[in-house]
């Protein structure tokens, strides 16, 4: 068994390539003001998926997976925004999509997961990225009001306190010697 594992380790994995990048226009999306305020987050993501499809004349039936990161999957960004946006963009219903949450690293984790799936041979073609409309997160979404990262688990909070993100960044920089 050990010999088989060693032999498999020496085999080369399929390479994964990023062939394009697209994003939405920057703008203010705060409720009631700004050029993006009336857009649904899924519709905004769908415009990006439509553009990628158009640029490369993609047959969406050939897309093995859409991997989308979104750290606030509630309200308008809930219900697997990656899958809903793919359907909104006109993707074939056989093309799957998933939404994952790794807080601020959700988008890059999605790209990494898509690449890993290709490199392992599980998928041939993936579309990956992130979707987040900050106006629909904690301050304006009633489902998120008073919600904490630990989901209200007081025992977990006791073991792992939740300082503010900015304080965490300063602490990590100090501990790791970044200036």
Model-derived features: positions:
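Conserved "HGTGT" condensation-loop signature of ketosynthase/thiolase-family condensing enzymes
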Residues: 2-95, 131-179
């Amino acid at each position: 068994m050990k010999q088989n594992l060693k032999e498999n380790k020496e085999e080369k994995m399929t390479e994964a390539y990023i062939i394009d990048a697209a994003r939405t226009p920057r703008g203010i999306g705060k409720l009631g003001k700004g050029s993006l305020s009336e857009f649904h987050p899924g519709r905004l993501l769908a415009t990006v998926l439509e553009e990628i499809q158009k640029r490369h004349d993609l047959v969406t039936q050939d897309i093995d997976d859409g991997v989308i990161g979104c750290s606030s999957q509630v309200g308008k960004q809930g219900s697997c925004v990656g899958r809903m946006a793919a359907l909104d963009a006109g993707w074939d219903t056989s093309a799957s999509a998933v939404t994952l949450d790794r807080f601020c690293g959700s988008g890059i984790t999605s790209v990494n997961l898509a690449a890993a799936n290709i490199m392992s041979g599980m998928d041939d073609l993936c579309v990956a990225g992130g979707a987040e409309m900050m106006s629909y997160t904690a301050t304006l979404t009633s489902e998120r009001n008073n919600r904490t990262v630990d989901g209200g688990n007081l025992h977990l909070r006791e073991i792992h306190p939740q300082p503010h993100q900015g304080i965490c960044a300063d602490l990590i920089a100090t501990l790791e010697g970044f200036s």
